[in-house]
């Protein structure tokens, strides 16, 4: 997804003072093509208006040939002028690079999984936020996060990847990178006038944290630090489309936070996000709750109709660019402590325990013979533990016999019920060919009778009841409510529930 954040007030008018006029603006929607989103925060979405108050809007097509030619011309001409001392001839201009399609990792990569490109529209002020998706889609495992961060860190150490922060300082190489970043913003934000993007990126009060791979800019974040107020305002952020799904968006934001804290002395970031960008900001630690004193930021940034003001507090101790190492060390410390208190890390060999018909074991095995069970804290009195055991004799042997008799009685009552006929035998696949494709865990009264008679399968009443309930559930899953099978299952289930309750009451009275 592509996008930008609200521009600094100094660029909304002709002046560059920190206390520029305080006006409200609307966030017009802007369409983007070839924008993608993934669940790993690698793409971003817009968070600011797509038009400048002082410049006319551009055509909405990001693939305009004139637009691309202008972008490339500006970079080639600028490079030649700075490094060679003279502009190149128009006929000798190098061909355009193939990877001209880009996507912004703007101060906002919005929703985590957007399967369609057009769902990554920029600055969609009329978009609706899905609160459920905001939390369910943004779930990210720390294991995957750490693996990506460590991979990118290795690339940085190898020199293939750099994260550098520069402003308009007049250095040739830095200026070339800034022009490249400007082109990324311009391609990805078609409704944002180029002149306005240039004004912010090249303004000396703004800084740009850039992702540089093999000496080529592949993305960046432009922001304005208000050092006297100790907060920064994010303006633009983008990652090229062919470098997405690699974690650059998150890594870029982490570098920005650490640089803003250590170099600029900032404690907070503020930005205006549209609804599509909120998801990305939440992943990066932004919230809609503004804790920063209003006196510190009011009048320094603009209010925008259709935008959501979001804040990120920069932690003063977190190693943002080395979070993966911190997480790994924390896990190691926790794992070592667990090993001191438990032997759960020991893996025992499996058990050769073959079963025959109806799931009844060929031979019995005492729980105490299972390796590791006692070491895990098991005690013999836990065998056959049941909530309903209080209704039976405290003696285990007597309890087992009473339980078996109860289950036999229940099965007898079930078999005699007039609605039990569909459940007495296993379903014949020759009569119902697709039954076992739909019902993966079949059960019937005959199979349950075999399990009861083995006196080895049902060690608690709850196990018996669970099988019976599954039988009713299977019937209701396979058959529609208007069928006789569904109705039989409903009536028989009600009968069974009442019978279990009455039998337990009788057993409790006797004991």
From Swiss-Prot:
Active site positions: 233 (proton donor/acceptor)
GN (gene name): GCN5
Major place of residence: nucleus
One GO MF term attached to the UniProt entry: DNA binding
E.C. number: 2.3.1.48
SUPFAM superfamilies: Acyl-CoA N-acyltransferases (Nat) (SSF55729), Bromodomain (SSF47370)
Boundaries of every N-acetyltransferase domain copy: 168-315
SMART domains hit by this protein: BROMO (SM00297)
Organism for this UniProt entry: Oryza sativa subsp. japonica (Rice)
GO cellular component terms given for this protein: histone acetyltransferase complex; nucleus
This protein's name: Histone acetyltransferase GCN5
BP GO terms, sorted: chromatin remodeling; flower development; positive regulation of transcription by RNA polymerase II; positive regulation of wax biosynthetic process; regulation of vegetative phase change; response to light stimulus; root morphogenesis; transcription elongation-coupled chromatin remodeling
């Amino acid at each position: 997804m592509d996008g930008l954040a609200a521009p600094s007030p100094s660029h909304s008018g002709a002046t560059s003072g920190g206390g520029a006029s305080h006006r409200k603006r609307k966030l017009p929607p802007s369409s983007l093509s070839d924008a993608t989103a993934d669940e790993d925060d690698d793409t971003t979405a817009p968070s600011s208006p797509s038009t400048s108050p002082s410049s006319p809007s551009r055509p909405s097509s990001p693939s305009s040939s004139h637009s691309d030619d202008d972008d490339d011309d500006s970079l080639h001409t600028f490079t030649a002028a700075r490094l060679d001392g003279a502009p190149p001839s128009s006929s000798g201009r190098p061909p355009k690079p193939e990877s001209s399609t880009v996507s912004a990792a703007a101060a906002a990569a919005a929703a985590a999984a957007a399967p369609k490109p057009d769902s990554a529209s920029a600055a969609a002020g009329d978009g609706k936020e899905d609160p459920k998706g905001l939390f369910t889609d943004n779930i990210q495992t720390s294991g995957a996060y750490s693996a990506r961060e460590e991979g990118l860190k290795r690339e940085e150490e190898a020199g293939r990847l750099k994260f550098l922060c520069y402003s308009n300082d007049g250095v040739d190489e830095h200026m070339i990178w800034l022009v490249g970043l400007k082109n990324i913003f311009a391609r990805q934000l078609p409704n944002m006038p180029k002149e306005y993007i240039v004004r912010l990126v090249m303004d000396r009060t703004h800084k740009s944290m850039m992702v540089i791979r093999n000496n080529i800019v592949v993305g960046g974040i432009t922001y304005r630090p208000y050092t006297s107020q100790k907060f920064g305002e994010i303006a633009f952020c983008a990652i090229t489309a062919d470098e997405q799904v690699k974690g650059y968006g998150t890594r870029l934001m982490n570098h920005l936070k650490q640089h803003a804290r250590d170099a600029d002395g900032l404690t907070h970031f503020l930005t205006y996000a549209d609804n599509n960008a909120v998801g990305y900001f939440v992943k990066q630690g932004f919230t809609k709750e503004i804790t920063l004193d209003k006196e510190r930021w009011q009048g320094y940034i603009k209010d925008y109709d259709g935008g959501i003001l979001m804040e990120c507090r920069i932690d003063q101790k977190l190693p943002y660019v080395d979070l993966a190492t911190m997480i790994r060390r924390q896990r190691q410390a926790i794992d070592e402590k667990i090993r001191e208190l438990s032997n759960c890390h020991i893996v025992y060999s499996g058990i050769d325990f073959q079963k025959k018909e109806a799931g009844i074991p060929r031979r019995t095995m005492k729980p105490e013979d299972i390796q590791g069970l006692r070491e895990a804290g098991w005690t013999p009195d836990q065998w056959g533990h049941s909530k309903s055991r209080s209704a039976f004799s405290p003696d285990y042997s007597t309890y087992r016999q009473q339980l078996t008799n109860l289950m036999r009685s229940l099965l007898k009552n079930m078999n005699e019920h007039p609605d039990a006929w569909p459940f007495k035998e296993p379903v014949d696949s020759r009569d119902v060919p697709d039954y076992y494709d739909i019902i993966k865990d079949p059960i019937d009264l005959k199979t349950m009778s075999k399990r009861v008679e083995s006196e080895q399968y049902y060690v608690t009443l709850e196990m018996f009841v669970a099988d019976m309930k599954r039988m009713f559930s299977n019937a209701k899953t396979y058959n529609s409510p208007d069928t006789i099978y569904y109705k039989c299952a409903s009536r028989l289930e009600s009968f069974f529930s009442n019978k279990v309750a009455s039998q337990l009451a009788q057993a409790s009275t006797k004991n």
